[in-house]
Structures are given as C-alpha cells and as structure tokens.
UniProtKB/Swiss-Prot annotation:
ATP 1 binds at residues 129, 169, 175-176, 208, 210, 215, 241-243, 285, 299. Disulfide bonds: none annotated. The lineage of its organism: Bacteria, Pseudomonadati, Pseudomonadota, Gammaproteobacteria, Vibrionales. PANTHER family: CARBAMOYL-PHOSPHATE SYNTHASE [AMMONIA], MITOCHONDRIAL, CARBAMOYLTRANSFERASE FAMILY MEMBER. It comes from the Bacteria. The keyword Amino-acid biosynthesis applies. Pathway: Amino-acid biosynthesis; L-arginine biosynthesis; carbamoyl phosphate from bicarbonate: step 1/1; Pyrimidine metabolism; UMP biosynthesis via de novo pathway; (S)-dihydroorotate from bicarbonate: step 1/3. Residues 936-1077 form the MGS-like domain. This is Carbamoyl phosphate synthase large chain.
Length: 1077
C-alpha cells in the first residue's frame, strides 16, 4: 500500500525538556520523523518546548512551535494549524500522555484529527497495567504475579498475594519514576505513597520480585500488512532489579540458545499483534529465570524509546524514520534500506557481525546525600555505546568512552587493605554505578566465577570474559615492557586494551606504547556498520575500529573537516553541545567539505549515519582520535563544539600534528589558565572580583583575610561547576579543603570574592579576527552565585540599562581580539551597583548557543563553523547584533524528584538536566510560558510562605505586597515576619522546625501552601532550612530559592501562558521585518 493521500498535514509531538529517563534520543527520533514525512510531501507541524534540539530548527518542519507540551496549548496549535493527523510515538512518555489527554478532552474529535502510529486504545492497553496483564494471559504469555492498587488499602491486599520483596511501579510514568523495591513494611509504605502521588492516574502496579532474573529486550517493527521484523535483541548484563536504563546492555543477546531466541521472537510478535501496534516500532521486555528457564513478559512500550535509539545505532537500521513512514501507510517491503543503497528492502532483518555494549553514565557526585545504589528507578543521566569484534573489545571501548577517568578495568580497591574483600562484596551485592570495576577487583582478590555470580547474578559467560581480562593484565605485568612482543601487543589490542591502560600496567608513558605500536605497525582498521554482515556492499560510511586484517574505511582525497563530539550526556555537558556539533557538520557539508563525525553517544543526532559524510562511532580519547586522523588525514579538526571532552585533547592533538582549526589551543589555554587570563584582563584594564589562586589550606586562609567573605571556591579547569561552593566564614573554608578537594601544585584552588545580589549576564559572540558580532545578551533571573547552567535567563535583558549593556559589548569585543578568538566565545559578567565585573570567558561553544539561535534566528553554530573554516562574517552577511522584538526566556529542569534526601537549593554547582524556552510579547508572558513548559503551574492565590536570609530582608517587603495584590495570604518565619510587620504587613507567624509545633513542615504536609519563597545563606542556615525545601518538593508545592525568581513569578501571574501560540517561523519573520524597519 503506498502512502495515504487523504491526509496532507501531520502534527508531531516532541518530548520536551531532557529529564532523567527521557533524554536526547527523542530529538533523534523526532528529527528523523520530520525528515521522513517531509520527504513524502506532507506538511509537518511540530511542537516541542526544548530549544536545544535539532528538531526545533526552523528548517526541520513547516511550522515549529516551541511551546509547552500541554493539551490546552496543543489545542490552540491544532485550532490554528488544522492538521489532519497527529503522530504521538516520537516524543516518549510526554507525547503519549499529551495525546491521550487530547483524546480524552475531545480535542481530536472536535477538530477531526486522526491519531496515527498508535491508537489511543493500543497506548492504553500497553500502559494500563491491568489491561496489559489480561491481554498477555489471552495469548498464553505469563506476566509476573501482580495487581494494581489505587489506595494504600488495596496495596496491602496485593502485598498479601505477592509477598516480599516486591516491585512497585506507578502507571503512566517514565524511567521508573516513583517506583522501587520494598523488602519490608516500612519501605513498602513509603514507596507506595510516593508512587500514588507521582502517577498521573494515581495507580500502582505491585508485582512479585524477579530480582536476579536475566533481562532481555526485543526491538520490533510491524506494519499494517502484518509484516514484522526484529531489528535487534538486547541483553542486560545486569540482572532484573536494576532499571534497564541503568543497566549495562549488550546487543545482540549473547547467552540465549537458539531455541530460547525463537521463543522470545515469536512472543514479541504475538505481543504487538495483541496490543494492536500496526505501524511502527515497539520494545518488548522479557525476564528469564536462569534456574528453570521460566519466561515472563515484563512490559512493552508502543513507541520509539531509548532502546530503539540504541538498536538503531547498533544496527544502522533507522527505526524512527521507518516507523514514521509506516504510520502514513507504507509497508516494510516498499521501503528501501538506505545503508545498502537500496539493495535490500526494510523488511530484511538486520544481521550484525560485531558486539555492541552500552554503559550508562551517572552523576551522583553532584547530589550530596542521594542514594547511589541502583534500583528499579532510573538514575543515569546519559550513556555511551561501543562496537567491537568481540565482547572484550566492545566492553573495553565502552569503559574508556564513559569519561570517568577509566582507561579500562582500573583498580578500585587497594587489595592489601584489611577490609578490601568486605568492600568488594558489598559493591557486588548492592550494585552502584561502578560495579563492573569491582567485579575485576573481585577476580584480582582471588574470588571464583561462582563466588562473583552468587553475589551479582550476572551471567557466568560475562564474568568469564572479565576474569580473562584480569588474567591477561597479570601476564602483561609479569612480562614487563620487554615482554611486549609484536604478538603479545597485537593480542592485547584485539582484546580492546587501550594504550593508556597498558602504560599504567607497565609503569611507562602512554606515548611509549604508541611508539612501540608504530614500530610493529600495529594499527586499528575500520569496519562498516552495514546492517547485513557484509553480504551487500554499503554506501554509508558508518565505521568502528578493530584490530582485524582488512580495512574498509576507503578514505577519499576530498578536503575534510573532522568534528569531535561530546561523548556521553552528563550534567553540565548535554544535548546543547551535540546541537553545535551537528550544526558544524551541516554547514561545512553545504560548503562542499567532506565532514567526519567522531562520537560515542547513541542517543544523539550527531551519531545518525546521515548527519555527516562519515561517522566514526568511537570513544573520544586521544588514542582513538589519532588513529582516525591517521587514516583520514583531515584538513582541520573542530574541538571547540563538544564541550570539555574534545577541548581537553586540543593540545595533545596539536602536538601530534593534527591541524586544529578556529581558536588555537594556546588561546583556549589563555582563557582557561587563571594566571595567563589575569594578565590579559589586566592589560585590558577590566574589572574582576578580587581573587587568588592557592595551593595549600594555609595560603587560602591567609588570602581569605585579604579578600573578605563570602568567597566562591573551586578547583581550576572544570565544567558545570564541579566541587564549587560559596563559603561564608573561615570555619567553612577549612571544611571545604578537608572534605571537597585535594589541593596541590598540579591542581590549585581558586578563590573569588562573591558578589552577593549581583545580576549575572551571559553573552555569546563570534569573532573572525576582523570583527566581533554579538549573538545575544542574556540577563539571568537568578542572581550571581547560582550556576549559569541552572539559572533562567531572558533575551533581550529585562532590567539592565542600555549604558551597562554597551559597556559589556565593548568588553566582549576587546576580549575576543586580545585572546585571538576565531569562532564562538561565551563571556559571563556580573553587574553590581552599576559596575560591570568580568567573571569568565570560554572561547568555545557554550550551552546557550541553541537558545540564542532560536531566539534571534541567527544560526550561531553554523556561522562560527564557517568562520573557523576561513570565511569572514562579512561574506556571510552577519555583521550586527540582532535584538528581537519579543522576549525569550530559558528555564531549566532539575532532577531533584529522583533523589530524595538531596537539598534542592540552587548554588554554584550545576545540577539541571535540561531546559525549556518560552516566548512572549512581554517578559511576563515569556516567563509564564517557560514555567508552564517545565510543568510549574502556579495556582491563582492561596497561601504563600516567606522565609528569607538576612541579605534579602530589604526587598522582601516589596515581594510581600506584590503577593498580597495577587490575592495570596501570607505566612512568614520569625525574622522575616518582624521586617514585614515594621512595614505594616502582618503575616501569620509560623514556627521553624525546632521552634515547636505545628511547625513549617506540618503546614506543608497539610497542603496549606500554594507557594513558598525560601532563601538561605551560610552553611548552618542552609542546613537548618533544608527540611523546608525537601518538604516543598515532596508535597509538590511550588517554591523558589531566590528572590529574583520570586519577583519574576509575580510578574508572570499577570500574563496568560495559554492565550496565544506563535511558530518559530513567524517569530523569525518578525525579526527580519524589524531589521528592515
């Protein structure tokens, strides 16, 4: 059946901001769907609130709405655009839930919009736990013993049936939010209450524990003629009990017998037929009891998922693209497989002759007090994928691609310490983020494969692979450097050992190992991911390295530019950097260069096989990048776009003769190295907060007496504010040195005078050596002291005077010329008492670039990439700053609900995972839209609680009167109440927790408040008020931890976020019109 002609326009629902459990894999699927549907001539309308996505670029869809993904707002878009159909399977749980709400509220019926890709009934049948259970029984498949509960009473009835331990999962949530494993009554009570609260339908599924069972996933695609293919089987290295998003996974499945595989394959197809998925991709999860082979079905997702992004990258089969085409009526046999250049149809199941390993990336160090053990609730923030010819090579490459400082199976424990074995046993039994390294330590300590299996339930086949790696390491150590013969070295490289790991084992420099490989002529060759195990020739240059015989890279002799990606997502380095890498590649491709992408993150658009001319799916480490450069010989390499990951390699690459284009590694160092930067600033006569660099605690104390408190303290060279703190007194400073950092001559600590209450400003600019053009000036809403990545911001500025802005423009220009920037530069300022202080300069792409590009319509990353390749700004027609005739506000999304026990106070350490954007004619409207996009819905009126720090007491009176005007009743804690009383406002007095009951927490728990403003400064005050913020979070009360955000919230009450919708294309037309005027 060819495509449908009865529909002309299709609305695609995006996934919104990046949160734990729902990351940039949906930008990848959404961007593919837009491309696929426009290719077929449909008009595509897209809604997604996340500006840091490729899919919201103005040329990806015909009409793009960066608006909150909420049914009332989407109804406005449907009313305006009148699409014929809506495709809800590309935007994760957010899109599914929104589509179901549109259906439930009659919006689809009202405007005659058809749901394609999945029916409301199929979504409901897969997501509603009790319906799913019945459906599985009807086709003879077993589910875990389970039942649903809507109250605590019902929950206890289910418990009687399943017993302890049991697994609790809320319905219609994502990434296991709110779920957990209960081993006793107390835990059961706590998890159930939390789950009932977090499920949109207030429903839980409680099932028998399958902890220790093996877990598998099948990625299935089905069309309406009932053709089904399995794209990929995935096996979880970690057994059941750990969320599959937090598990190490391997594809294809390694430990299934052929008979088991066929059983599972048939079961997956039966599931899709029964649920009624007619068009597109689904993922089906199974559990197998290793003791008796009993197989149960755990769940299925009737949409494109995190696993489908992984399966697409693992096989080269573009699931989202195919799913989008199936949704408009095509069948699999009518679609061509791009990778084999159309030699095979999409109805051929991919076959792969390599092993793929995915390892999740965690960020527990950012959440002091978080429970860092892995359970059924997802906690990882990103992932890395690696491809190898065998399991050991694949595993090794994934470990070094993670960028957690590992070069392979590095030792975690000092085996001579008395409690080494106790520590190892604990880490094996109670899995944390680092269990795989502890497994290697267990073998080093003499544990047997069975001993490790009994503690972990990880299949013995995987354990034997790790045991062998440990044995090989012992042999290398015993043989010493002289024992590295050509044969030994080649064998080690085939097993995936990195030069860095071998150098560690032998105690020589990494360059020594590289020299030896050159001498023996041992270099990696590149194999192609071709979907067909090399049975047909592949047109697509999608490569991975191995130490095999035949190289399939076949490089061309065109002019090439290589872009280094950012590796796995993590807090502080996320999708924004991938967005820049993709833009660099697209722009340079348009200009006729051959572009080469190097990256190892399976969720992203940059690792899509048709984003660049050639894709190398490899870890972004010095060894791997040098090997690719040796084969490809690029004219230039871009290191400034992937965040800190490629930037760290700049000097070493340059030293090895790799040509870095754009800002030179030396200039990058001048901005990053404190002392060299200081010299540049002094030469230009710019103002900086007083600061000092220290290498001992004594020095720090001495300097602090000169500079004065409060101080911002941090280690040098860091992204996302790791281990950064504001200290208020000497005792605090000493504690920081004892607890937070190891300070030394190699790693000094920086002290800066903290400008309390200053307004922070971010400026992105491009310099081509002749001129500097400002991309945008963003005024932060949270005051200085909150990490810029965690602060909301407005473009244009909403309170700063023209005079101050001009002062900053002038300084940016001077700095760009002084540092010799070629390409993008990000500068941060703080404004206090009409003085402009320079905080820092980053001569690279910053995380604000996508937001500025969407707000102004100027594609900064593309323009700057062309500058790096030698074009001037003038030749590109970008010569002056664009100030849009509307306001854009970026707001961040924080993951605190996943980490009970962590203080949600914003500070200098970055902890947000994603962002949304709101646009409006006024600042108030833009801010209101951004808040709605984050899901912060502020009720009209109610009761507000004010409890503020000393420094905020002057301004709190103004805030209180604004809240009264908006119809709020006021409560305040003692200090704040006294100030308000003096101003003639008499709030109700509430007790702090240690002042007797009923206290603040009691009132929060009784749902007395609709809004809480709490600011705190100083170690003790922050500690004392932590229970207040945790309470607000737990009871879902809106709260702000800065006064500026509270004032912005008051302003936003005057605007209606749902009143109007405007597409990006219309906004950019307004910009163009204002430029002509």
């Amino acid at each position: 059946m060819p495509k449908r002609t009865d529909i002309q326009s299709i609305l695609i629902l995006g996934a919104g901001p990046i949160v734990i459990g729902q990351a940039c894999e949906f930008d990848y699927s959404g961007a593919q769907a837009c491309k696929a549907l426009r290719e077929e001539g449909y008009r595509v309308i897209l809604v997604n609130s996340n500006p840091a996505t490729i899919m919201t670029d103005p040329d990806m869809a015909d009409a793009t709405y960066i608006e909150p993904i909420q049914w009332e707002v989407v109804r406005k878009i449907i009313e305006k655009e009148r699409p014929d159909a809506v495709l809800p399977t590309m935007g994760g749980q957010t899109a599914l839930n929104c589509a179901l709400a549109l259906e439930k509220h009659g919006v689809l019926a009202e405007f005659g919009v058809e749901m394609i890709g999945a029916t409301a009934d199929a979504i409901d049948k897969a997501e509603d736990r009790s319906r799913f259970d019945k459906a599985m029984k009807s086709i003879g498949l077993e589910c875990p013993r389970a039942d649903t509960a809507k109250t605590m009473e019902e929950a206890y009835k289910v418990l009687d049936m399943v017993g302890f331990p049991c697994i609790i999962r809320p319905s219609f949530t994502m990434g296991g939010t709110g779920g957990g494993i209960a081993y006793n009554k107390e835990e059961f009570e706590e998890i159930c209450r939390r789950g009932l609260d977090l499920s949109p339908t207030n429903e839980l599924l409680i099932d028998e524990s399958l902890i220790g069972w093996k877990e598998y996933e099948m990625e299935v695609v089905r069309d309406k003629a009932d053709n089904c293919i399995i794209v990929c089987s995935i096996e979880n290295f970690d057994p059941m009990g750990i969320h599959t998003g937090d598990s190490i996974t391997v594809a294809p499945a390694q430990t299934l017998t052929d008979k088991e595989y066929q059983l599972m394959r048939n079961a997956s197809l039966a599931v899709l037929r029964e649920i009624g998925v007619e068009t597109g991709g689904s993922n089906v999860q199974f559990g197998i009891n290793p003791k008796d082979g009993r197989m149960v079905i755990i769940e299925m997702n009737p949409r494109v998922s995190r696993s489908s992004a992984l399966a697409s990258k693992a096989t080269g089969f573009p699931i989202a693209k195919i799913a989008a085409k199936l949704a408009v009526g095509f069948t699999l046999d009518e679609l061509q497989n791009d990778i084999t250049g159309g030699a095979t149809p999409a109805s051929f199941e991919p076959t792969i002759d390599y092993v793929v390993t995915k390892i999740p990336r965690f960020n527990f160090e950012k959440f002091a007090g978080a429970n860092d053990r892995l359970t059924t609730q997802m906690k990882s923030v990103g992932e890395v994928m690696a491809i190898g010819r065998n399991q050991q090579e694949s595993l090794h490459k994934a470990l070094r691609g993670l960028e957690v400082g590992a070069t392979g199976f590095d030792e975690m424990v000092d085996l001579d310490s008395p409690d080494a074995l106790t520590k190892i046993r604990h880490e094996l039994k109670e899995a944390g983020a680092e269990r795989i390294w502890y497994i290697a330590d267990a073998f080093r300590a003499g544990m047997s494969v069975d001993g490790v299996f009994n503690l972990t339930n990880i299949d013995r086949w995987f354990l034997v692979q790790i045991e062998e790696i440990v044995k090989l390491e012992e042999q290398v150590k015993a043989g010493g450097f002289a024992g590295l013969t050509q044969d030994v070295l080649r064998q080690m490289k085939r097993k995936g050992f990195s030069d860095a790991r071998l150098s560690k084992l032998l105690g020589v420099a990494e360059s020594e190992i590289r020299r030896l490989r050159d001498q023996f002529d041992i270099h990696p060759v590149y194999k192609r991911v071709d979907t067909c195990a090399a049975e047909f020739s592949s047109d697509t240059a999608y490569m991975y390295s191995s130490y095999d015989d035949e190289c399939e890279a076949n490089p061309t002799d065109k002019e090439k530019i290589m872009v280094l990606g950012g590796g796995p997502n993590r807090i502080g380095q996320g999708i924004e950097f991938d967005y820049c890498c993709v833009h660099a590649s697209l722009a340079l491709r348009e200009d006729g260069y051959e572009t080469i992408m190097v990256n190892c993150n399976p969720e992203t658009v940059s690792t899509d096989y048709d984003t660049s001319d050639r894709l190398y799916f490899e870890p972004v480490t010095l060894e791997d990048v040098l090997a690719i450069a040796r084969v490809e010989k690029p004219k230039g390499v871009i290191v400034q776009y992937g965040g800190q990951t490629p930037l760290k390699l700049a000097r070493a690459l340059e030293a090895a003769g790799v040509p870095i284009i754009g800002t030179s590694p030396d200039a990058i160092d001048r901005a990053e190295d404190r002392e060299r930067f200081q010299q540049a600033v002094d030469r230009l006569g710019l103002l900086q907060p007083e600061n000092a660099t220290v290498t001992t605690m004594e020095q720090a104390v001495e300097k602090s007496r000169e500079i004065g408190f409060p101080l911002v303290v941090r280690p040098s060279y860091v992204l996302g504010g790791r281990a950064m703190e504001i200290v208020y007194d000497e005792q605090d400073l000493r504690r920081y040195f004892n607890e937070a950092v190891s300070v030394s001559n190699e790693s000094p600590v920086l002290l800066d005078r903290f400008l309390d209450d200053a307004i922070e400003v971010d400026i992105d600019a491009i310099c081509d050596g002749e001129r500097v053009v400002i991309g945008g000036i963003m005024e932060h809403i949270e005051q200085a002291g909150v990490h810029s990545g965690d602060s909301a911001c407005s473009l244009p500025a909403y309170t700063l005077s023209q005079e101050i802005q001009d002062k900053m423009r002038e300084q940016v220009e001077k700095l760009a010329f002084e540092l010799g920037v070629r390409g993008l530069m990000n500068t941060q300022f703080a404004v206090k008492d009409n003085e402009v202080y320079l905080i820092e300069v980053n001569p690279r792409a910053a995380r604000t670039v996508p937001f500025v590009s969407k707000a102004t319509g100027a594609p900064l990353a593309k323009i700057a990439a062309r500058v790096m390749a030698g074009q001037s700004l003038e030749s590109q027609g970008f010569t002056k700053e664009i100030i849009p005739p509307y306001y854009s506000v970026k707001e961040v999304v924080l993951p605190f609900n996943k980490f009970p026990g962590v203080d949600p106070l914003l500070g200098p350490e970055m902890r947000s995972t994603g962002e949304v954007m709101g646009v409006g004619a006024t600042f108030a409207e833009a801010y209101a839209k951004a808040e709605l996009g984050c899901g912060n819905v502020y009720p009209e009126g109610g009761r507000a609680l004010l409890s503020v720090r000393e420094g905020d007491k002057q301004r709190v009176v103004d805030l209180a009167s604004k809240l009264l005007k908006l119809g709020y009743k006021l409560d305040a804690t003692h200090g704040t109440a006294v100030i308000l009383g003096e101003a003639g406002i008499n709030p109700r007095l509430v007790n702090k927790v240690h002042e007797g009951r009923p206290h603040i927490l009691d009132r929060i728990k009784n749902n007395e408040y609709t809004y809480i403003v709490n600011t705190a400064a100083g170690r003790q005050a922050i500690e004392d008020s932590k229970v207040l913020r945790r309470g607000a979070l737990a009871e879902k009360v809106n709260y702000t931890t800065t006064l500026n955000a509270a004032f912005a919230t008051c302003m936003s009450h005057t605007a209606d976020a749902k009143a109007s919708v405007t597409s990006v294309q219309e906004l950019h037309a307004q910009v163009q019109a204002s430029l002509k005027a």
